[in-house]
Amino acid sequence: MPKRTDLQTILILGSGPIQIGQAAEFDYSGTQALKALRGEGYRVVLVNSNPATIMTDPDLADATYLEPLTPEFVEKIIALEKPDAILPTLGGQTALNLAMELHERGTLEKYGVELIGAGVEAIKKGEDRELFQAAMKKIGVETARGKMVHSMEEAVEYQKEIGLPIVIRPSFTLGGTGGGIAHTYEEFLAITEGGLRDSPVTSVLLEESILGWKEYELEVMRDTADTVIIITSIENFDPMGVHTGDSITVAPAQTLSDVEYQRLRNQSLAIIREIGVATGGSNIQFAVNPDNGRVIVIEMNPRVSRSSALASKATGFPIAKIAALLAVGYHLDELPNDITRVTPASFEPSIDYVVTKIPRFAFEKFPGTSDHLGTQMRSVGEVMAIGRTFKESLQKALRSTESDIRGVYAEMDEAGLRALLYPNPRRIEAVIELLRRGESIDALFDATKIDRWFLEQIKEIIDAEHELLELGPISEWKYEYWREVKRLGFSDARIGEIVGLSELQVRQLRKAARATPVYKTVDTCAAEFEAYTPYHYSTYEWEDEVTGTDKPKVVILGSGPNRIGQGVEFDYATVHAVWALQEAGYETIMVNSNPETVSTDYDTADRLYFEPLTFEDVMNIVDHEKPVGVIVQLGGQTPLKLAKKLADAGAPIIGTSPETIHEAEDRASFNALCERLGLSQPRGKVAETPEQARQLAAELGFPLMARPSYVLGGRAMRTVRSMEELVTYLDEVYAAVEGQPSILLDQFLEGALELDVDTLCDGERAVVAGIMEHVEAAGVHSGDSACVLPPVNLSAELLARVKADTERLALELGVRGLMNVQWAVKDGTAYILEANPRASRTVPFVSKAVNHPLAKSAARIAVGHTLEQIGLTETPEAAMYSVKEVHLPFLKFKGVSPILGPEMKSTGESMGIDADPYLAFYRAQLGAKSYLPLSGTALLLGDGLDEVASTLQGAGLNVIREQDGNTLPDLLIDVTGSPLLRTALERGVPIVSTREAAVWTSKAIAAAQGSELRVRSLQDWQTQEAVAG
């Protein structure tokens, strides 16, 4: 059936700030849906509080609301925009829960808005554990034995019946939040209590343990004609007990027989029909008992999910785009497959390669928390690799994670390695090293329950390592040898380690033997039809499937896996660069390994290489494509680290030169440059060794800010207040950071106000694009501080000085593109802290706040355009106050105190916009899920809060200065760092831990008291006159 014509305006709900369990995959799916629906002529309205996304760019939707994802704000948008329908299946759990709240409040009925994609009943059946179990029973699909309970009394009663271990799964939560596996009665009580609290409907499912079973997922799509297709099967390398988001996964499933696969397929078809997902995609998870083949369904997500993004990238089938079109009435057989152009979307994808996904973790950011993986997701990003075999795919995925830690494991004894066989991020490395040492597959299977087939495959890689030494001198290897070795996924660097040569020596010998990769195409049909979308991966075979063109080409390096400190903001910058260069007439080539992102969509760049971001893999592409330029400064630290090596090998790096990058990143040369320019710096020195650091600290005095060269996200950065603290810090930093980094010791400017300045420079002229004032004082990482643009608390004279000095610095360095500079203002003097001649994480926020696409301009500068040609010759004036606030993942890391410091810990951000800076701050807080109360009790702990107390009392809150028994307040402001902060966080009470944020919070509450908080689209804001600033 053709698309519905009774719908004119469709409201899409986004997913809000990036958080663990809900990351960049929803920017990718939302962006696809926006393009698809607008392409069909619908008016599309988007609400999403996350400015770091492509989907919230003003030209993607007809009206974009950077507003909190709360029922109150969305109702105001519905009243204003009068949508005919809401599509809630593309914004993760946040959007589904919000749709249900709007239904329950009567908002949908009041305004006559229809839910499309998934109806209320389907969402309830898919998400409510009790209803799901009943539905499965009805169609004869087995679920784990279990019971839904709504109180501790019920839970204790049922636990007696089912025993231990026991799985606790709260209803309607994200990424397994609040759940877990209890092995002891004490754990059972603690997890269940937390789960009941975290579930918005106060219910948890208690289930029999299926630890150690094999886990599979099927990605399923259905249309209103009841055509159901399977996009792909996905197998979890890690057995049951590890959240699928934290597990290594493989597509297609490797260890299922055809009969077993058909059984899961048939059950999936029955499940999606019974749940009632009439249109769109669902992800269905199964567990299979390896001993007897018993199959149970674990759960389904009646929406586009993290696995959908992986399945899309693994197969080339655009699940989110097709889901959006099915939601407006199309049938699968009416939609063409973009890649083949001859097959309809009702053809199930078929693939002739293997895809491996490996998650990326950030436990090093949260010392003291356990790295034991369970049913609560804790990874912050992921990589994907494609190979012709599992072995090739696994080795490529391992090197894509950028955590080259082979040496660490080689030095461990066997007892230490065996101690790492519990579910944790390092288990795969321990398994590999133990196999290297001769551990048996049976012993490893007993310890890990990782399927023997996977262990056999890894053992074959290890056997090949031994065989390499028997092939004779590497200089005499024939092409056939090289081909067989490389088809197992071995990198030049790893071959070099084994045979005792450098990576560059191996590369030269390999090229001399004419052993270079060919590039295959991801085509959805296992090469049965011609593919029109150039989406490629490398392997070592005969036939190359890349067809060249005569257009000048530019390679843009992506940012690899998301992590704390290098998130979706850098993907945003690389996508903008692609668009700008396409407009300028270049053929764009994207290289990236992250399946969650817009940059790795098959129709973003002219050509996509899904490859690891390593010197070897990137240089192979440069050799193959012969581009006129390679852009490294938009993808964060990952491509920057490759810049010098690529340039030395002949890659034409364009934009800011590797020499400039080095001059700004290397602390000693940067300090000398600032002295030459007469820029004030905190007193500081660079130490090359721990001994020198101790000596310099004694000269400078404490407190000091200590930071290593070449790090992102404040990695290993700390405020040290005594020699003892410094000694401990040095021991830790030399253990945690690769190589022997030089360390900058700076006088710490206690209580200074920090500024972030983003600048564009074309080599002849520099223009500051935006100056952000931090809410938090110096000492809190810039990525964890809220910030406001334009600044509120600084004089015009000081801002003019900062602007002029920043522009002088950019010109002196020879920046060609973007530069971010951080300043600290104390007693009327601005001190320069650091300069980064690259895109910073504030680029998307500033681009929206000042209505200028900074990353697009940086890309145009890289290919020779001037700021004058671009049309940016002076600092743009902001039409509104914009506040960026961060989302912090403390809840996922038990026992960690939610206190901010110089090491970055946030995973995402929200944006608030208003004509009043304090109302913009209030909106940003709500957008980051910190729901500041406008009434009730505020508990203030610590000195220096009298002004805050007075403001809150004036706003009508009851202010108390000590805790009333065990009763928690409605707002906790605690600058003493007490354990109450953690307790309040776990109970959902908004917390503030610094005096600076407390001042802003109190003023925001007072401002919100007397305001209607009207909603206004970003497009509308950007057309008005500038605010003062």
UniProtKB/Swiss-Prot annotation:
Residues where ATP 1 binds: 129, 169, 175-176, 208, 210, 215, 241-243, 285, 299
Residues annotated for Mg(2+) 4 binding in this entry: 834, 836
Pfam families: CPSase_L_D2, CPSase_L_D3
Binding locations of ATP 2: 707, 747, 749, 754, 779-782, 822, 834
Region (Oligomerization domain): 403-544
Positions of the UniProt region annotated as Allosteric domain: 930-1029
Region of interest (Carboxyphosphate synthetic domain), residue spans: 1-402
The ATP-grasp domain, residue ranges: 133-328, 671-863
Cofactor(s) needed by this chain: Mg(2+); Mn(2+)
Known catalytic reactions: hydrogencarbonate + L-glutamine + 2 ATP + H2O = carbamoyl phosphate + L-glutamate + 2 ADP + phosphate + 2 H(+)
Binding sites annotated in the UniProt record for Mn(2+) 3: 822, 834
Pathway: Amino-acid biosynthesis; L-arginine biosynthesis; carbamoyl phosphate from bicarbonate: step 1/1; Pyrimidine metabolism; UMP biosynthesis via de novo pathway; (S)-dihydroorotate from bicarbonate: step 1/3
Annotated PROSITE patterns: ATP_GRASP, CPSASE_2, MGS
Region (Carbamoyl phosphate synthetic domain): 545-929
GO molecular function: ATP binding; carbamoyl-phosphate synthase (ammonia) activity; carbamoyl-phosphate synthase (glutamine-hydrolyzing) activity; metal ion binding
One of the GO biological process terms: 'de novo' UMP biosynthetic process
Free-text function comment from the UniProt entry: Large subunit of the glutamine-dependent carbamoyl phosphate synthetase (CPSase). CPSase catalyzes the formation of carbamoyl phosphate from the ammonia moiety of glutamine, carbonate, and phosphate donated by ATP, constituting the first step of 2 biosynthetic pathways, one leading to arginine and/or urea and the other to pyrimidine nucleotides.
NCBIfam families attached to this UniProt entry: CPSaseII_lrg, PRK05294.1, PRK12815.1
Protein family membership: Belongs to the CarB family.
Protein name: Carbamoyl phosphate synthase large chain
Organism: Deinococcus deserti (strain DSM 17065 / CIP 109153 / LMG 22923 / VCD115)
